[in-house]
Curated annotation (Swiss-Prot):
It is found in: Nucleus. Present with 7130 molecules/cell in log phase SD medium. In contrast to other GTP-binding proteins, this family is characterized by a circular permutation of the GTPase motifs described by a G4-G1-G3 pattern. Residues 1-53 are annotated as: Disordered. GTP binds at residues 213-216, 287-294, 336-339. One of its GO terms (biological process) is ribosomal large subunit export from nucleus. PANTHER family: GTP-BINDING PROTEIN-RELATED, GUANINE NUCLEOTIDE-BINDING PROTEIN-LIKE 3 HOMOLOG. InterPro entries: G_CP_dom, Gnl3_N_dom, GTP-bd, GTP-bd_ortho_bundle_sf, P-loop_NTPase, TRAFAC_YlqF/YawG_RiboMat. It comes from Saccharomyces cerevisiae (strain ATCC 204508 / S288c) (Baker's yeast). This is Nuclear GTP-binding protein NUG1. GTPase required for 60S ribosomal subunit export to the cytoplasm. Keywords: GTP-binding, Nucleotide-binding, Nucleus, Phosphoprotein, Protein transport, Ribosome biogenesis, Transport.
């Protein structure tokens, strides 16, 4: 049998080009017809809806309808408030737009005024009235001291911080005349260590002031409770070291960065002028990592809204790695220090619980958090204690109805929801709960999640505070302190002239409470 030769598939160029032209003309015609078609086609996928056999369908539909009605009421209420505010401003002769922009442009306008004053002084050849040094002439000294020693393989970040505690803290205490202990306003008690207070009281001639930072993240009534609680032990000053919360919800707007930082700086200068020292006093700043120590120093260095950044800052713990001394003027120096995880006073807590609490205090960088789930679970339990925090939390993450009887089950379903919404998925579309947990902790660190802790005003807690302040554990016996806490607060307040500052801050807090009440 003769095998036939395979027929060639070669075609002429004329035939090939003809096919191409016909195909192109066909596609062009189809595209033109599609444009003329009036039928609307959405590119987004259609919502499949709720299955009819789903047992909670009726309940979910009711909740969706209730949410729509609630959102509509909120929009109408906000519109009515805007109209009333515009009407009131018009009656007073003030433009509503200008009234809203006053606070936002406060720092920028102050900086422009100061720049104009300095330029005029240079042009006229007259010296400036400000005795302080300029921002670009700040005298900054870095002390490169090895606080952590040699790296040990397998040593955790918490163990390194414990090792550096004695060296860093002792260096700051010995070099400082005044200690600014920075606390996180959302949870001051957890960022506070009684051993630090005892060590300062044991050092003769040292003064301790509690700085309640991040006051823009808590409501005025919570701030007022914490101030009353902390003022019974030491002088406490609220401070807003950063420009504002990134979540758009900011409390205590009357306590601006310029107002609080200027008041604190004036108090330090008053103490410096009243002290009989022939040298400049040194103000040491201590606290947990990421509570805002460097931001406090930068706020103090700001000249009427200036943008001095003598200390590097960041939203993650561990930015400051060495002692840094900044000279403000001839009578005042500030000493910045790395964050310290102070030794825990509760020995009954497990290592996992302690690390979860540190993660919730933003004291651990994200790369050192092994398992974020315990910290997220602790956060969920904290937010569940208040309806205001719970509603804000659900609104932020758009949490659907989750059938859960306990916090553990709810947290797992919540992390699955966050992982799917933010694309934190692993192989095969499996939700990555660890990545979702870190994302939630980052939102908490950045202030996107509204949350706070109320002070424990029980009799047992008050008695424990008095006992801690009235005695110092020296290792062998209890050494009494000469003055009680009320005497300490009154005497130190006079030295820093804090009475006028406290009265002005109380008025600002009351004004913030009235403003929040009107917005509600």
């Amino acid at each position: 049998m003769r095998v036939r030769k395979r027929q060639s598939r070669r075609t002429s160029t004329k035939l090939k080009e003809g096919i191409k032209k016909k195909a192109s003309a066909h596609r062009k015609k189809e595209k033109k017809m599609a444009k003329k078609d009036v039928t609307w086609r959405s590119r987004s996928k259609k919502d499949p809806g709720i299955p009819s056999n789903f047992p909670y369908k009726a309940k979910i539909l009711e909740e969706i309808e209730a949410k729509k009605m609630k959102d509509l009421e909120e929009r109408e209420l906000a519109k009515q408030q805007r109209l009333e505010a515009r009407k009131a401003a018009k009656e007073q002769g003030v433009d509503a737009m200008d009234e809203d922009m006053i606070e936002d442009d406060e720092n920028g306008l102050a900086a422009l005024v100061e720049s104009a004053q300095q330029a005029a002084a240079e042009y006229e050849g007259t010296p400036s009235n400000d005795a302080d040094v300029r921002d670009d002439e700040l005298d900054v000294i870095d002390y490169n001291i090895d606080f952590y020693g040699e790296d040990v393989e397998g040593e955790s970040e918490l163990e390194k911080s414990r090792k550096a505690y004695d060296k860093i803290f002792k260096s700051v205490i010995d070099a400082s005349d005044v200690i600014l202990y920075v606390l996180d306003a959302r949870d001051p008690e957890s960022t506070r260590s009684r051993k630090v207070e005892e060590a300062v009281l044991q050092s003769q001639g040292k003064r301790l002031i509690l700085i309640l930072n991040k006051v823009d993240l808590i409501p005025p009534h919570v701030l007022e409770q914490w101030l009353n609680y902390l003022k019974s032990s030491f002088p406490t000053i609220p401070l807003r070291a950063s420009s504002g919360a990134v979540n758009g919800t900011s409390f205590n707007r009357k306590l601006s960065q310029t107002t609080t930082a200027s008041a604190l700086l004036e108090s330090l200068k008053t103490y410096s002028n009243n002290s009989n020292l022939k040298r400049s006093i040194v103000v040491g700043v201590i606290g947990y990592p990421n509570v805002g120590k460097s931001s406090v120093i930068n706020a103090l260095l700001a000249r009427r809204g200036g943008q001095s950044k003598a200390c590097p800052v960041g939203n993650e713990a561990g930015v400051t790695t060495s002692l840094r001394e900044i000279k403000i003027d001839n009578k005042l120096k500030i000493l910045d220090s790395p964050g310290i995880c102070f030794p825990s006073e509760n020995k009954k807590r497990s290592k996992v619980e302690h690390e979860a609490e540190l993660a919730l205090l933003n004291a651990l960088p994200a790369k050192h958090i092994v398992d974020p789930y315990p910290a997220v679970l602790m956060l969920v339990k904290r937010l569940a204690k208040s309806d205001e925090m719970t509603e804000s939390f659900k609104k932020l993450y758009e949490i659907p109805p989750i059938p859960a009887n306990d916090a553990d089950t709810f947290t797992k379903h919540f992390l699955i929801h966050v992982a799917r919404k933010r694309g934190r998925l692993g192989k095969g579309g499996i939700p990555n709960l660890a990545s979702a947990g870190l994302s939630v902790l980052n939102d908490w660190r950045d202030g996107k999640i509204l949350g706070w802790v109320l002070p424990n005003t029980s009799a047992a807690a008050s008695q424990q505070d008095k006992q801690n302040l009235s005695t110092i554990n020296t290792g062998t016996k209890q050494a009494p302190i000469a003055a009680n806490e009320s005497t300490i607060v009154s005497e130190w307040s006079k030295e820093f002239d804090l009475d006028g500052l406290f009265s002005s801050l109380d008025k600002a807090i009351d004004a913030s409470k009235d403003q929040d009440t009107m917005m509600e």
